[in-house]
Amino acid sequence: SVHYDDELLGRVIADLKAKGEWDDTMLVVTADHGQSFNDFGRNYWGHNSNFASPQVLVPMIVNGPGVEPGRVEGMTSHLDVAPMLMRHALGCTNPLSDYAMGKDLLAPGIDHPWVQSSSYIDYGIIEPDRITVVDGTGQWDIVDRQLKPIEDAEFSPAVFEAMQWFRQFYR
């Protein structure tokens, strides 16, 4: 499938160049999830079964006017795509908080202290050293980034911050 995706992407780029639109186009290629192959020996395969890095880290390629080659090392979210596009593709200059929850992916040093990720029924608050997983009934577990339970762990301040952040959607 990667070969086929590459072929299709090549066609899109060739078409944009043929129409003279390539130099004015911001192209973003990414995925909605990663894939587990029993990476941590905990029998997780596929996707949508946990919030560890093999399932939530996705590749992203961004090309366009003013986009410098580089790699983002900090913790980011797909919520950061819209602010990037609004600022760099559409030229919006007002504060990002006027229209988005995320940050500009092209801003130097972008690195969230936590990000939220969801599956069909669960969500996770992902921090550099832990993941707090909350299921559809409100039951929770705290695991390390390799999915090993952290015994007697308490909620970090990030979980409370995330709950406040979520409230704006559930009033």
Each language-model region and where it sits:
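Histidine-centered active-site microenvironments of extracellular/periplasmic hydrolases
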Residues: 17, 21-67
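Beta-strand elements within well-structured catalytic alpha/beta cores of enzymes
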Residues: 2-5, 9-12, 26-34, 60-62, ...
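Generic structural "secondary-structure junction" signal
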Residues: 4-6, 39, 103, 107-108
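Extracytoplasmic/periplasmic, Sec-exported soluble proteins
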Residues: 1-4, 53, 70-77
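Membrane-interface soluble catalytic domains
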Residues: 14-23, 64-171
